[in-house]
Amino acid sequence: MEPAFGEVNQLGGVFVNGRPLPNAIRLRIVELAQLGIRPCDISRQLRVSHGCVSKILARYNETGSILPGAIGGSKPRVTTPTVVKHIRTYKQRDPGIFAWEIRDRLLADGVCDKYNVPSVSSISRILRNKIGNLAQQGHYDSYKQHQPAPQPALPYNHIYSYPSPITAAAAKVPTPPGVPAIPGSVALPRTWPSSHSVTDILGIRSITDQGVSDSSPYHSPKVEEWSSLGRNNFSAAAPHAVNGLEKGALEQEAKYGQAPNGLPAVSSFVSASSMAPYPTPAQVSPYMTYSAAPSGYVAGHGWQHAGSTPLSPHNCDIPTSLAFKGMQAAREGSHSVAASAL
């Protein structure tokens, strides 16, 4: 008689989840298998899952029984409180003892016999779940006693420290003897101004970095000196070139400076030591006056053809209307044009 409650499997049979198959169906499965019917046919005929049929037949072939559950009954519980107490004692005496050593000692001390002694896996589980917490707590207490006081955490990275008024004051004021010096990286972080000035955008170095830059052969002015810097400070350079730049180019940049705006008045000049030298410009042929179309000028390559001359690198004749002038005359003409434009 089928139970009144249960679930329906894919074959249409009714089963109860978690309950063994009835003994009558088990016996019928074994009888059909002895008649030579395949397990898949038995599964479709009795509407029992194929896995259940295979499991029952495998158990019958091994043990000769069709009853569910363990044949010899369940194993009695071996991890009694007495055994756990002895295991804890062994672990406290020798914290580095292994599970198999505990098992051998239980047998040697007569706590257990060969029938009820716990397995190595059971002893490991007891050590991990019941005794491991106590051992870890003891190790933590001993470690906490020997642990030094924690160092105060830095508010930011000490390698790339932001300049601050406190660090600047500490750099100026000498430290009295007997008082430990406070490193600049432990100071409070910089309070950024509300207005975005040119000094903040360019990231001008503060006084705290002056000690690092003193070793360099170039002189870098302080923050207080930036407002007093002007065009006259750069007049002591060479008359023809300043750090690889021509004098005319510097004068043109000085004349066409940025227009004043609403930002705080900060000089836009940068010291020559902080500027990387510009690459040397390529030598250009002397200036020439021309009467042909502008499209006739093509920038020549550095190499020359085998049959060409320095004046005609592409082995072509230059029109007679192109009259070359000397370098000095061309420069004088360019200066006069620049003066008239101003």
Curated annotation (Swiss-Prot):
Q: Which InterPro entries match?
A: Homeodomain-like_sf, PAIRED_DNA-bd_dom, Paired_dom, PAX_fam, WH-like_DNA-bd_sf
Question: Which residue ranges are recorded for the region named PAI subdomain?
Answer: 7-63
Per the record, the GO terms for biological process are: cellular response to growth factor stimulus; endoderm development; face morphogenesis; negative regulation of DNA-templated transcription; odontogenesis; positive regulation of transcription by RNA polymerase II; regulation of odontogenesis; regulation of transcription by RNA polymerase II
DNA-binding region residues: the ranges are 4-130
What domain of life does the native source organism fall in? Eukaryota
Annotated region described as RED subdomain, given as residue ranges: 82-130
Q: Name one GO molecular function term.
A: DNA-binding transcription activator activity, RNA polymerase II-specific
Q: What is its subcellular localisation?
A: Nucleus
List the residue ranges of the region (Interaction with KDM5B): 168-189
Q: Which UniProt keywords apply?
A: Developmental protein, DNA-binding, Nucleus, Paired box, Transcription, Transcription regulation
User: Which GO cellular component terms, listed alphabetically, does the Swiss-Prot or TrEMBL entry include?
Assistant: nucleus
Q: Chief subcellular site?
A: nucleus
| Role noted for this protein | Transcription factor required for normal development of thymus, parathyroid glands, ultimobranchial bodies, teeth, skeletal elements of skull and larynx as well as distal limbs.
Task: Outline the subunit composition.
Answer: Interacts with KDM5B.
Q: What is this protein called?
A: Paired box protein Pax-9
Q: Please state the gene responsible for encoding this protein.
A: Pax9
